[in-house]
């Protein structure tokens, strides 16, 4: 990894400061982490995070998925975004430099700028959970980008060395490149800390990879943001399940994230207290039949409740480093990928290894569930959100459909108070659940709530399952 030494006591910095120019070792670490090691204790990055006082300079819309671009183009995109913001914000460092005209390829990738909050001093908190941007004076949260929503991070070029840029998705700006101006010599520390957070997040992924989550290009939750919310739901928004104490973003987004440390195997929880650890309730016996005889399902005991903690509060995967080298070393075949000494750099945020790792046959349990659902009249197979909503006529109508984007995921669609609701039924561990209970199967969940006339609580309102919308044969 090429390094440049700055004068005037400036710290050694990675050229361009990109997160994406290294490979992973077989143990999930950077081949070239800083020679002095990571700057912060791991438990701090995995816990409250590390904070820096920087200036938020705005963001520039990114019109293409960063995963569709090669590493060099990604770097050009972030540096061009830095230059655009430098020109637009008075007093920005590097603003006096004359920028070359934006090339046609880059102009087709970058869109409009959003300079709301530009120039505002903020506290940037970096952790394995998110990058949190909070106004330094009024403590207002400007943005909270979960790790799974971040696709690339980079420093500036030699003329904009004090900038850090990262590309993330949120419900307001969609996919955008956010620009941070750092005090002199601090930009590399910020980049290094983000790199440390991603390495630790990746190790968490290796210890507990999700079984059913396919890492497609989607958004993470966006909590307590100061951005004005959109009036229309973007086409790539999906669903938002109710979490205690949280308000859903307008239109809803996918939240398939699991807090680390939630342990299975405990029974019915007591009310929250300092002595009550959070846990997941035990599932019902797997061998107990749930399909076929409705009377047998009706007589099942109620499912054990889950803990009250926010089950999906953290992302279950992040955009991290390519594992080609580790896979080749393990397989003992194929030439190594040249990366460090002169060849194309590797991309820290390459999602292909995750897609490859998750492209596997479904477990027997999910196969059995799919077979069981095919016998249920209210199951419609793969159906889009729009198509499902068109089938709902009166309050209490409901159906279950298979997600068109996530294999093994099932969605409950129902009509309540004239508004359609869409609830994900399978968590990242492959468990059928609502906010309060775990179930043996989707059929058990539906029959339990329908036969006992119990509503499903979601987003602060109730969804009652009264009239199943049967599929047409």
UniProtKB/Swiss-Prot annotation:
Q: Residues where Phosphoserine occurs?
A: 29, 343
Query: Where does the sequence pass through the membrane?
Result: none
Q: Which domain of life is it from?
A: Eukaryota
One GO BP: insulin receptor signaling pathway
Pull one GO CC term from this UniProt entry: plasma membrane
Q: What is its main location?
A: cytoplasm
Q: Which residues form the SH2 domain?
A: 378-469
**N6-acetyllysine is carried by which residues?**
44
Q: Name one Pfam family in it.
A: PID
> What do we know about how this protein assembles, alone or with others?
Interacts with CPNE3; this interaction may mediate the binding of CPNE3 with ERBB2. Interacts with the Trk receptors NTRK1, NTRK2 and NTRK3; in a phosphotyrosine-dependent manner. Interacts with the NPXY motif of tyrosine-phosphorylated IGF1R and INSR in vitro via the PID domain. Once activated, binds to GRB2. Interacts with tyrosine-phosphorylated CD3T and DDR2. Interacts with the N-terminal region of APS. Interacts with phosphorylated LRP1 and IRS4. Interacts with INPP5D/SHIP1 and INPPL1/SHIP2. Interacts with ALK, GAB2, GRB7 and KIT. Interacts with PTPN6/SHP (tyrosine phosphorylated).
Functional note: Signaling adapter that couples activated growth factor receptors to signaling pathways. Participates in a signaling cascade initiated by activated KIT and KITLG/SCF. Participates in signaling downstream of the angiopoietin receptor TEK/TIE2, and plays a role in the regulation of endothelial cell migration and sprouting angiogenesis.
Any idea what this protein is called?
Answer: SHC-transforming protein 1
Q: Which organism is it from?
A: Bos taurus (Bovine)
């Amino acid at each position: 990894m090429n390094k440049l030494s700055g004068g005037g006591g400036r710290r050694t910095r990675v050229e361009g400061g990109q997160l994406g120019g290294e490979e992973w070792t077989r143990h999930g670490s950077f081949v070239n982490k800083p020679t002095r090691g990571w700057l912060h204790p791991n438990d701090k990055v995995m816990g409250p995070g590390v904070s820096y006082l920087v200036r938020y300079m705005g963001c520039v819309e990114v019109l293409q998925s960063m995963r569709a671009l090669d590493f060099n183009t990604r770097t050009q995109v972030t540096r061009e975004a830095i230059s655009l913001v430098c020109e637009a914000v008075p007093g920005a460092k590097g603003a006096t430099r004359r920028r070359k005209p934006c090339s046609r390829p880059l102009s087709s990738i970058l869109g409009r700028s959003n300079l709301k909050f530009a120039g505002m001093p903020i506290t940037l908190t970096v952790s394995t959970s998110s990058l949190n941007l909070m106004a330094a004076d009024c403590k207002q949260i400007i943005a909270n980008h979960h790790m799974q929503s971040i696709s690339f991070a980079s420093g500036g070029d030699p003329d904009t060395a004090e900038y850090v840029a990262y590309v993330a998705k949120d419900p307001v700006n969609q996919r955008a490149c956010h620009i941070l101006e750092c005090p002199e010599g601090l930009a590399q520390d910020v980049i290094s800390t983000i790199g440390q957070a991603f390495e630790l997040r990746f190790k968490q992924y290796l210890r507990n990879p999700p079984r059913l989550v396919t890492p497609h290009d989607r958004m993470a939750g966006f909590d307590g943001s100061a951005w004005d919310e959109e009036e229309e739901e973007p086409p790539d928004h999906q669903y938002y399940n109710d979490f205690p104490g949280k308000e859903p973003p307008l239109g809803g987004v996918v939240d398939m994230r699991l807090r680390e440390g939630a342990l299975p195997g405990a029974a019915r929880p007591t009310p929250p207290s300092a002595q009550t650890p959070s846990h997941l309730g035990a599932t019902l016996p797997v061998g107990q039949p749930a399909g076929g005889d409705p009377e047998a399902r009706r007589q099942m005991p109620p499912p054990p409740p889950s803990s009250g903690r926010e089950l999906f509060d953290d992302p279950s995967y992040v955009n991290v480093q390519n594992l080609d080298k580790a896979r080749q070393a393990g397989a003992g075949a194929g030439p190594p990928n040249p990366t460090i000494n002169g060849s194309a750099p590797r991309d820290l945020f390459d999602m292909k290894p995750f897609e490859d790792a998750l492209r596997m046959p479904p477990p027997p349990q999910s196969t059995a569930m799919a077979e069981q659902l095919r016998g249920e009249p209210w199951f419609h197979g793969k159906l889009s959100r729009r198509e499902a909503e068109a089938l709902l006529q009166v309050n209490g109508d409901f159906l279950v459909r298979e997600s068109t984007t996530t294999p093994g995921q099932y969605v409950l669609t129902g009509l309540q108070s004239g508004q359609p609701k869409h609830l994900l039924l399978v968590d990242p561990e492959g468990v059928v659940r609502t906010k309060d209970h775990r179930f043996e199967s989707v059929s058990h969940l539906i029959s339990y709530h329908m036969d006992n006339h119990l509503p499903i609580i979601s987003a602060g309102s109730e969804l009652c399952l009264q009239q199943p919308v049967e599929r047409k044969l």
